[in-house]
Amino acid sequence: QNARLVMNAEEYYRTMFQGRVSSWNLRDRHMADTLEALDAHLTGRAGKSAKIVVWEHNSHLGDARATEVADMGEWNVGQLTREHWGRRAVRLIGFSTYHGTVTAASGWDEPPQTKRVNPGLPHSYEDVFHQTGLSHFYLDLRQPGSLAAEALREGRLQRAIGVVYLPRTERQSHYFFARLSDQFDAMIHIDETHAVGPLERGGAAGDEPPETYPSGL
């Protein structure tokens, strides 16, 4: 695994100069490869199929083929795990919220802040879930003949908030079109979310060279 990490890290830094899609794909491929190696190790040690839970942002977890990023040639962990193990063995569960607060930064390498999340855009998946009037719910999208699953297969805007959140440019920065029922196997919706906080306050990170240092290479 250490050798695989060194090899993929070296290739990752090369692809950073080629564009976002190349570096994104390599990073998610590495995460999927690591998951496959972990599964093989745990299965071999226990003598039976392993069960693994992975916690990721929706943009890494929801099957990229069901979103507009697939048109740019982008894939992710959710797609790769379905392709490797098959849909019967994988459960992709997404999270969504309509409004509230979130812990995020205004830019990479900037300190975290508690930010107010804008209400979901009209006709987005977040807005549709808000219109139910429920404060929270779990929605199984794999039920045969489910009317909800069929209705949510229609392409709609979906919000993705990660390390960075930019409320002023939210439509351009955080929304993309998706087909929810093809993207996820289930959804957990929390209508009003609350920002997470660290269990322990750590010190500020020291000065580090940029990822692409030395920039002349």
Regions picked out by a protein language model, each given a short descriptive name:
Residues Q1-K51, N58:
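A charged, amphipathic alpha-helical module
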Residues M7, L26-T34, E56, M72-N76, ...:
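Generic recognition of stable, solvent-exposed alpha-helical segments in well-folded globular domains
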Residues K48-I52, R87-V90:
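Loop/turn elements at helix/coil->beta-strand transitions in domains of secreted/extracellular proteins
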Residues V53-W55, I188:
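Structural motif
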Residues W55-E56, G94:
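Short beta-strand segments
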Residues G62-L217:
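C-terminal regions of proteins
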